[in-house]
């Protein structure tokens, strides 16, 4: 009998069982790092960068090759995420939903969706404050969220030398 969450076929890729460096990779670690930085500068998030590396460059996982994650590579190069990517995507969704509600104020389902979404944002923010990925005084504010989303996922700083 199938599990509760997965009914019928759900398409997904399987991660390699043992994360080793595949023989078919034609790129050396420096080239892979350059590709990652270029994609980040184009505005792609770490998850999308991973998908592009897998689908277009034939690189299944970055960590076995470089010994560090995509986010760590970007931070070494001075490209830092404003907030963690999953939180940023939720905030982006909330901003778009608020814009929708300005045009359609009677959409009660969207209002409920916004309440649920903002609750999820606050819960996730609490977690990130607890583990130290967000400052203790960080607070979700819908007006600030618009500015955060408009500014993008990354801030470029001077690389640590």
Curated annotation (Swiss-Prot):
Q: For the region Disordered, give the residue spans.
A: 1-22
Entry keyword annotation includes Ribonucleoprotein: yes
Q: Which UniProt keywords apply?
A: Ribonucleoprotein, Ribosomal protein
Q: Name one GO molecular function term.
A: small ribosomal subunit rRNA binding
Q: Which Gene3D superfamilies match?
A: 4.10.860.130, S15/NS1, RNA-binding (1.10.287.10)
Segments of skewed composition (Basic residues): 1-13
Q: What InterPro entries does UniProt report for this protein, alphabetically?
A: Ribosomal_uS15, Ribosomal_uS15_arc_euk, Ribosomal_uS15_N, uS15_NS1_RNA-bd_sf
Biological process according to GO? translation
A GO CC annotation recorded here is: cytosolic small ribosomal subunit
Any Pfam family matching the protein? Ribosomal_S13_N
HAMAP family linked to this entry:
Ribosomal_uS15_A
Q: Which family does it belong to?
A: Belongs to the universal ribosomal protein uS15 family.
Quaternary structure and partners: Part of the 30S ribosomal subunit.
Checking PANTHER family in the record gives: RIBOSOMAL PROTEIN S15P/S13E, SMALL RIBOSOMAL SUBUNIT PROTEIN US15
Q: What is this protein called?
A: Small ribosomal subunit protein uS15
Taxonomic placement: Archaea, Thermoproteota, Thermoprotei, Desulfurococcales, Pyrodictiaceae
């Amino acid at each position: 009998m199938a599990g509760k969450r997965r009914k019928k076929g759900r398409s997904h890729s399987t991660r390699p069982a043992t994360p080793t460096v595949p023989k078919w990779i034609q790129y050396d670690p420096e080239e892979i790092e350059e590709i990652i930085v270029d994609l980040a500068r184009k505005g792609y998030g770490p998850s999308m960068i991973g998908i592009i590396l897998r689908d277009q460059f034939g690189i299944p996982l970055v960590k076995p090759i470089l010994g560090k994650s995509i986010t760590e590579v970007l931070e070494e190069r001075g490209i830092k995420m404003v907030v963690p990517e999953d939180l940023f995507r939720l905030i982006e969704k909330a901003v778009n939903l608020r814009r929708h509600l300005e045009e359609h104020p009677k959409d009660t389902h969207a209002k409920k969706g916004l309440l649920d979404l903002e609750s999820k944002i606050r819960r996730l923010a609490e977690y990130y404050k607890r583990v130290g990925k967000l400052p203790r005084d960080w607070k979700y504010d819908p007006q600030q969220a618009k500015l955060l989303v408009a500014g993008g996922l990354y801030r470029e700083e001077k690389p640590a030398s």
